[in-house]
């Protein structure tokens, strides 16, 4: 497994701009051969906007089942976990409606 440690880039993630930058760093890892651990240990804040831009927009690159096979989460605090789940649910719903 490959680890992507979000705390390398900060502890508070609130902007779409940062979400896009980190998604661009994540995508080559996720497209690699090993499963990627998305490690949020030490991260205090993950906004809905950041979660959508960084995590949920990965659904534009691959189906949900493939994303689940290629990634796993670690160290999300309850509020950050909720932001990620809400972002994934909303993005999935939008993509499902478009198909």
What is the predicted function of each stretch?
Residues 96-99:
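Extended, charge-rich low-complexity interaction segments
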Residues 10-35, 40-89:
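Amphipathic alpha-helical interaction surfaces in cytosolic regulatory modules
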Residues 92-93:
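Helix-rich interaction surfaces within compact, conserved domain-sized segments
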Residues 1-10:
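N-terminal presequence-like segments and adjacent domain-start helices
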